[in-house]
Amino acid sequence: MTNAAGSSSALQNRFRTHYCGSLGPVLQQEKVSLAGWVHRIRDHGGLVFIDLRDHTGICQLVIQPEEKELFEQASHLHAESVIAIEGSVVLRSPETVNARLASGAIEVVVSALTVESNARPLPFPVADELPTSEELRLKYRFIDLRREKIHENIIFRSRVSSAIRRYLEERDFVEIQTPILTSSSPEGARDFLVPSRLHPGKFYALPQAPQQFKQLLMVAGFPRYFQIAPCFRDEDARADRSPGEFYQLDMEMAFIEQDDLFEILEGMFRHLVTSMSKKRITAFPFPRISYRDVMNRFGTDKPDLRIPLEIADVTPLFVNSGFKVFAANTKEGCAVKALVLKGRGTESRLFYDKAEKRAKELGSAGLAYIQFREEGLKGPIVKFMSEGEIASMKEQLSLETGDVVFFAAGKWEAACRIMGGMRTYFGELFTLDHDELSFCWIVDFPMYEYNEEAGKIDFSHNPFSMPQGEMEALETMDPLELLAYQYDIVCNGIELSSGAIRNHRPDIMYRAFEIAGYSKEDVDLRFGHMIEAFKLGAPPHGGIAPGLDRLVMILRDEQNIREVIAFPMNQQAEDLMMSAPSEVTTAQLRELHIKLDLPKED
């Protein structure tokens, strides 16, 4: 458990004068009062030892055999019973010192014991932390939270939140709470709807994010806003995403440019990493990589920069190639991407079969490769390649004997993503340093993309981002060449947040939406309150909202987001402990003017 401060007047009451984790040799012969949970209890031939646990740690209690009444009380105790004791601190003999405990040099000889609550047998042990099903852990989460690792995770999360608040307040940010009941926004993920009793047939929505409120705060004259905000989205669970509810550090700043926000966030992350963990940041300031560049080099806009592999574009090599499949692709405007694995050219056939299976899972028709072996070239496309093509390839990719190069072809983005998926797959061959945090910014996202299914131009990402070049760019450039002031922050392949410099100009907003096929009336109908606010004096502004849950996951080396949330739902968006969601009474539904139309059971 995490150590806390020692005795203080604030904690001196009838239950305790000290915390378990604060006891040490300096308190020898002092009388103390302690309270907590029975972690373990052992009878050693007349001596009873109790490991007492509170939120700061564990200390050992001793009940002497001559203390008949205490001995009798202890004989009826179960693990996780709650007790309060009085006793004297004594030094342990040298051979019994427990170096694993902060209080391991002492023990407390008990003179009085009160059983506040005797626990019945537990559904799973706390002390031994044996493997336990997630269903059982979530049903009895209050017991699971007593376990050392998850207990420390929750305390650590609290400290991260406090450190964030201090850091931002020192830089003139103001913490402001925004509404939990708001209007529905069907353009995003599915909303959680809340029926209104006072307005029959109408619904509130729980906010997916405080996006519009924080922008309105900029209009209201609060130039630096933040809150650790609850957000609600009716979406499926993943290992790094909790269904239903999550928390984000919501931030917005007025009169800034992109680099101003980067400086604030980079400084905050560096402060958190250096002050709260043993991890280290690879590069500071964080590298900036354009969307086009990150896709070409890593095949994803969420790259794990610890993986020592980069993708190469070899399209020109195949324009007139004897390998007709790739040559035909290049003539259709497609790209050919390559990935080199140094020293892996002699792997077994099983290695290549597994790699091809993964490539097909990523959407590729197959996986072409060439092995550069001592005895010559091997691979499914070698026979189609001329000596000149091989020589050019070796020169461009710095290939040597013992290497292997893999290829993927297709439309630019598809080829990039297939090879990016293979880069991540092959990344498992390397031992990545879990104490290294490789942050980067992804910038210069495209403003628009072509929706082939709809046959029209759509917004690529956030429609409220300011286009680079503003109105002039919208009027003069090919929409598919336009870039937005939008950015993502990524760490070790995990996207922590997206953000943007906002479009605060109604004239630019109308034109940006017009290019995507929206009329002025459409924009006013959907976003009229924002447009109206911007017409009444809106400063340039931008923001970001890193996920608190994911940040704590990274700092604590957790693979599952439920390990850093006190009361998470399961994968099916159920709270097993509170039995939510649950049915409600007919009277409750009638009061809300709701009639159920449930799907028929199979």
Swiss-Prot record:
Residue numbers marked as site, Important for tRNA non-discrimination: 44
Subcellular location: Cytoplasm
Catalytic activity: tRNA(Asx) + L-aspartate + ATP = L-aspartyl-tRNA(Asx) + AMP + diphosphate
SUPFAM superfamilies assigned: Class II aaRS and biotin synthetases, GAD domain-like, Nucleic acid-binding proteins
Residues where ATP binds: 233-235, 495, 547-550
Quaternary data: Homodimer.
Family indicated by similarity: Belongs to the class-II aminoacyl-tRNA synthetase family. Type 1 subfamily.
Matching HAMAP family: Asp_tRNA_synth_type1 (MF_00044)
Name of this protein: Aspartate--tRNA(Asp/Asn) ligase
